[in-house]
């Protein structure tokens, strides 16, 4: 991560040993629910509303039904157009890093199970459906290491398989921070680049790791070849790759290695910050060489989210996503973080073409750790405090729940236009079952009576300033 700004029981099919746990409390304020479907997939003759306010007094709160009307008095603030269809959307997520797994394993089995249900089970909590998983050592692993089968058995793997059990639609994308030290110019996991003569061996290493996870019951669906290839971290595993190295590695080595292994995975290029989009553009510039690339993955720490649109416009048919975006101490309170997530991630990234959105650590402690030499002020989607036994959701947790709980993986982004000058940010989805999800953020300084028109019908809702709302019908 380059922020230069700013067992439990055995896994289903082994890659766990029981871990000692301490008594703690789960203090996540999420209503209990036994449904196995996402809220947005329930067809209804009326609209339902869920709201998170800027003060945090309401957090993904069910505000009950909102009636449709056929009246047309006044100009609508938002028009939802089912006929305008854009990219498929596969969900929101995070990363179960080594730090996250160790912290979650301090929880008693029943508490940890409830936390996992509230995070991953469709229709309950926030409905994460994507995990971007570090492959080997990274800035939030317990140490620097190269992947070997069995290395993740104690902590990470059992949580991955539990998440997959809770959500059968879960998709995992693997991302390495470094090639094994023996394949690098530095002879170390820290620093250096990939030796050209070891590109084939590295590709086989990646394919072997993906196969090992799949055999252990982890639903691996995608792969990047290098986390932040433009950045060489000084104190933890990392590796630089220039554009030509990435292109050659993807096309000539990784794609063939996956094919030989019988693996059909999406290959994601870049896996770096928004401001590196010209690198992705150059990587994709030769049509004959871009065939191996399914999409381009971005991080949020530098540059602007419009980078996704730059790639979509220049390279039609290439998917884009946000594969890492940490919260941290730089956020100025609940309202500030909620606004960022709503405007930049949930609305901004999706309207610019994102197929999925991922935060960074699923869980960290109150000090932003444990770390392995990287970011010292990051924050997890939830904060686990082993000393007090509390698990506290972040504002980003609730923000991501406004999409994850209601949008089914494979949904289609559809037209949603806010009236000019309305201070409303919005994005809409149509689920595979035909139900609709509308996400609206009021970026104004006062409460708004929001009028929404869709399919010849209208509904209205009084939305406080700085509030995020999800409407389903």
Predicted feature descriptions by range:
Residues 292-302, 331-346:
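Extracellular glycoside hydrolase catalytic/binding regions
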Residues 226:
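Function-critical acidic carboxylates
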